[in-house]
Curated annotation (Swiss-Prot):
Gene3D superfamilies: 3.60.21.50. This is DNA polymerase epsilon subunit B. It comes from Cryptococcus neoformans var. neoformans serotype D (strain JEC21 / ATCC MYA-565). Heterotetramer. Consists of four subunits: POL2, DPB2, DPB3 and DPB4. It is found in: Nucleus.
Amino acid sequence: MVNQMRSAIVKVFSTKHSLTLPAPALHYIEEVLIENEIPEDEWMVGLEFWAKEYLKAEDSSSLVSLQALKKAYENLQLGTTEDTQVADPSEVNVESHFSVVDSFDMPAMRYDPVRSGFVQSKAQPSVAGQASSRSAFLRERWAIIKEIILRNENFTPPAIGGHDRANYLKLTSIRNLLGRAGQLFLLFGMLARNEEGKLCLEDGESRVVLDMEDAVPGEGLFTEGCMVLIEGEYTVEETVRVLAMGHPPSERRNIARSLHGHVDFLGGGAVSLKEEQKYNPTVLANTQISFVILSDVWLDHPRTMPALRQMFEGYANTAEYRPMVFVLCGNFCQGGWEGQEGLKRYSRGFNSLAELLQSIPLLHSSHFVFVPGPSDPWSSTTLPRPSLPSAFTTRLSNRIPNARFVSNPCRLKYFGMEIVICREDLMGKMMRNLVVVKEGEEMNMKRYLVQTILDQAHLSPLPISVRPTLWEYDHALRLYPMPSAVVLADKYERYELTYEGCHVFNPGKFVGGIGEDGWEFEWSMYYPATGRSERSVLTME
């Protein structure tokens, strides 16, 4: 009987659908047929349904994986095949599709240039980090962006014999420049400094010194650590005379998701594009759902608590439009936490906030997410940085069940959407470390910053000497696939704009200062249904 069963499995999966079944997958199919006591005359029909369900999945391949096979079987059991109609918004529990992701809980997905895909690291990331990982994370960042470039239509070779075959853009590696002085090349690599302090370009294989005298930069901010495209002439001095410099092209979220939709970047299970489309009507129907984002919530400022009370009570009294989540970003103390008095002041601030939130029961159904700022304890200089110490937060956590103290950065997952929250004074750091920037009347530094971050697909495209990062947690700073939205909470003035489908905004400082009508407090509200944010202002005498 076993031989007949195996023959039927091979006939359907291998002969008919040209699928290769490894031993574990074959044994699993046999176990399912035996455990469910499927009659022999129903084997072929059941196996046919199973094979077709497997082939519908986005991560299906000719070599059948046990995980994908199990998922196809579960879909058949639940009746949730890819042909299932869209979900009824009134029947979907929105809360079950919302989660907060800490950077230190994200799976360590590493890019494999051979497979042109992501695989989960077998080793657990370490905060200390091995010496080998210091160079590995830069090579990985370079490889990811290079793959994006080569997929771009301007770099894709036309069909053989096509009229434009000679005109498409071609990258040249730095080591292939030798002996070709006087010729023009298009190079891709990372801006860095050599031992003599000269600006150079590195591509993982070699490096070359750059002559920037005639360089014309494109839009964006160019600093050391950025991956850039350079058009220039190789000279007899073995340098490149740069004619033009630009950021690499970005890749929209839907394109990246179509390629890597089966990869679980955030943990908690991957959401396929078809699953995302299934719940799109639910996201669009819930126009009342919002995320409130505040930054620099100085709990030691005398006017902060009254302003927070008025804001929270205002939201609590509008049940239909009560925010789903409040994200409070640091710094949480204007005067600093150092010293005995500073620690007491910091503790008093969070204790007062705990009492305030407990006094408004209507808000207890909302989530509260706390993201540390650069000056919060214990003043970690690296990204990602851990959550606030429990010594200050235990009282609030005990009183407010939905309070989460997470890393900086962190991410919000809402159905198939991903919202990145990062508290970092990034504009100032980028401006202080500029190598070159395009000048002119239309110069827009806010747009340049957003374009740079998304084109670089990274929250910190700076050298680790300027902005230290945890090498083995670099995946937590990655912006690939491009998120649905990015909150760049910065002490710089607020802004909001959309680039390549990704909405990026800075809510500004909560305590805005004195205006014409009194003290002003500002924050941002993000609406997942529209994918846009808006400014909110509270004025108090």
